[in-house]
């Protein structure tokens, strides 16, 4: 009898993968590795470098294939043509967000990153318009970034060319830009509220980038019933939302609907305009989560790019020299960089683009979800299926970028030395779900890096050839190793 039970269990295990595929919404999913019962393909994937695992699978199954993260199928799209087709040509059909991601559970469907449907459409449209139009009749966002760039330079000057870890300073600058846009005012770098906020965002960034949280994404039951670092992330989010709630209350007391001071004011005015609409998406809960989203997305990603960028520049002092020569020729020493300078600085512009391309910050994009049954190439993908697009396969395409694993600003220059645009440049994703803060992030990266190199030459503590550029972690986001640098005044 025991032998019969064992054989029955073994047979069930063998049949279960095919039953999964046949029963999932009647669709015809792309091929992929055979999943194990319950676990799916998680044992065949390296969550410390998921991008590499998916690239290896694409060599076997082609540009579109299926992996099972637990019992949930995820369609993986690899290579420029397939990614463009998915995110641009089928942008509407693939505009959903998974409800099973840990971050989606934390946000409860609110905000601008993990919301869906009407709420996402209206919140995204409002956020884009507010960020784009912000500064009309007031200080522009560019002026706020320039002010922060000046403060950043002064903080670096205080190091007196001594070796330092730049992590905090390079995190404080983009965080303060967001504070200026959201709360009207920037903070001093020693302000305790500011330090606490930065600490919570930084800790959550590490937690959400950990293999454990990626594992929780595969098995959502772990999030609800098991201990782990995700519990700390929940506490941190409560802390941040409590702080934002107090800021909102202060804004409500002094709100002038004819003179909005910042993002919160604009949202509160929109709430007032729609107060008679019981179906309005402009609520306090949505404001809280949207502000949290803007902070999380607009601080850590820009900070990490700046840190990784400086590390690469230290490894390539010849690039620093060329950028500084261009800065001297176009800007000089007696004024701050501005965005109008960028069109006259092709090498600097190319360097900023190459930093983003090379570091491949978010290799696999944030997962999309089909909002309807979808025919994609020769496959039928059911509504509610997660789709993972490999941005890494686009940014490191060897046809568009010869020697893609080499850091070379020439990837974005033509034969005459002019800046060359590329459709393959999509570190912010592309299509309907492209990053809301793309324009702000591009501005910050150009102005911050240009201001730093206008005033300093970053020097490593080792020979440039020995600078370690390998990522400290390659989870959802690629994070550079910790390092020390000397900022030598120019």
Curated annotation (Swiss-Prot):
Please tell me which top-level EC class this enzyme sits in: oxidoreductase
Name of the molecule in the record: Cytochrome P450 2C2
Q: Which gene encodes it?
A: CYP2C2
Please give the PROSITE patterns that the UniProt record associates with this protein: CYTOCHROME_P450 (PS00086)
**Subcellular location, in the record's words?**
Endoplasmic reticulum membrane; Microsome membrane
**Which family, according to UniProt?**
Belongs to the cytochrome P450 family.
Tell me one GO molecular function of this protein: iron ion binding
| Binding-site positions, heme | 435
Q: What induces it?
A: By phenobarbital.
So where does this one cross the membrane? none
Asked if the keyword Endoplasmic reticulum belongs to this entry, the reply reads: yes
The protein's role, per its UniProt record = Cytochromes P450 are a group of heme-thiolate monooxygenases. In liver microsomes, this enzyme is involved in an NADPH-dependent electron transport pathway. It oxidizes a variety of structurally unrelated compounds, including steroids, fatty acids, and xenobiotics. In the epoxidation of arachidonic acid it generates only 14,15- and 11,12-cis-epoxyeicosatrienoic acids.
Q: Which reaction does it catalyse?
A: an organic molecule + reduced [NADPH--hemoprotein reductase] + O2 = an alcohol + oxidized [NADPH--hemoprotein reductase] + H2O + H(+)
Using the record, list the residue span of the signal peptide; answer none if the entry has no such feature.
Answer: none
Biological process (GO) annotations held by this record are: organic acid metabolic process; xenobiotic metabolic process
**Main location group:** endoplasmic reticulum
Indicate yes or no for the key word Heme.
yes
Which topology term describes how it sits in the membrane? Peripheral membrane protein
Under Enzyme Commission nomenclature, its number is: 1.14.14.1
- A Pfam family: p450
Q: Which UniProt keywords apply?
A: Endoplasmic reticulum, Heme, Iron, Membrane, Metal-binding, Microsome, Monooxygenase, Oxidoreductase
InterPro entries documented for this protein: Cyt_P450 (IPR001128), Cyt_P450_CS (IPR017972), Cyt_P450_E_grp-I (IPR002401), Cyt_P450_sf (IPR036396), Cytochrome_P450_fam2 (IPR050182)
One cellular component (GO) term of this entry: endoplasmic reticulum membrane
**Would you say which domain of life the source belongs to?**
Eukaryota
What are its cofactors? heme
């Amino acid at each position: 009898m025991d032998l019969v039970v064992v054989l029955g269990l073994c047979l069930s295990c063998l049949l279960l993968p095919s039953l999964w595929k046949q029963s999932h919404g009647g669709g015809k999913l792309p091929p992929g590795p055979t999943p194990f019962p319950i676990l799916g393909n998680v044992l065949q994937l390296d969550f410390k470098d998921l991008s590499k695992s998916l690239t290896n699978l694409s060599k076997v199954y082609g540009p579109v294939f299926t992996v099972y993260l637990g019992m949930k199928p995820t369609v993986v799209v690899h290579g420029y043509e397939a990614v463009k087709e998915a995110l641009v040509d089928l942008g509407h059909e693939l505009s959903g967000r998974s409800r099973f991601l840990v971050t989606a559970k934390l946000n409860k469907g609110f905000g601008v990153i993990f919301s869906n449907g009407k709420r996402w459409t209206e919140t995204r449209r409002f956020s884009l318009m507010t960020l784009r139009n912000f500064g009309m009749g007031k200080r522009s966002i560019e002026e706020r970034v320039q002010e922060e760039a000046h403060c950043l330079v002064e903080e670096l000057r205080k190091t007196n060319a001594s070796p330092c870890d730049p992590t905090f300073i390079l995190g404080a600058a983009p965080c303060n830009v967001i504070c200026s846009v959201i709360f009207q005012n920037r903070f001093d770098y020693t302000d305790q509220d500011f330090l606490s906020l930065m600490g919570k965002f930084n800790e959550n960034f590490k937690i959400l980038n950990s293999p454990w949280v990626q594992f929780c994404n595969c098995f959502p039951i772990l999030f609800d019933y098991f201990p782990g670092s995700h519990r700390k992330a929940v506490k941190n989010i409560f802390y941040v939302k409590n702080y934002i709630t107090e800021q909102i209350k202060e804004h409500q007391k002094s709100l002038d609907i004819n003179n909005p001071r910042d993002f919160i004011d604009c949202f509160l005015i929109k709430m007032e305009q729609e107060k008679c609409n019981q179906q309005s998406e402009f609520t306090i809960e949505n404001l809280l989560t949207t502000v949290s989203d803007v902070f999380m997305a607009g601080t850590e990603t820009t900070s990490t790019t700046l840190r990784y960028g400086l590390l690469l520049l230290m490894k390539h002092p010849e690039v620093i020299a060329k950028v500084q020569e261009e800065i001297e020729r176009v800007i000089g020493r007696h004024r701050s960089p501005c965005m109008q300078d960028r069109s006259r600085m092709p090498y600097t512009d190319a360097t900023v683009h190459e930093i983003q391309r090379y570091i491949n910050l978010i290799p696999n994009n944030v997962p999309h979800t089909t909002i309807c049954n979808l025919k994609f190439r020769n496959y039928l993908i059911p509504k509610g299926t997660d789709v993972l697009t490999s941005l890494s396969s686009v940014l490191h395409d060897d046809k568009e970028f010869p020697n893609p694993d080499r850091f070379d600003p020439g990837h974005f220059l033509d034969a005459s030395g002019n800046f060359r645009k590329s459709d393959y440049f999509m570190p912010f994703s592309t299509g309907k779900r492209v990053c809301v803060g793309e324009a702000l992030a591009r501005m910050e990266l150009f102005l911050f890096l240009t201001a730093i190199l206008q005033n300093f030459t970053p020097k490593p503590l080792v020979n440039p050839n020995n600078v370690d550029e390998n990522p400290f972690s390659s989870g959802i986001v690629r994070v550079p190793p910790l390092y020390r640098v000397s900022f030598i005044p120019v």
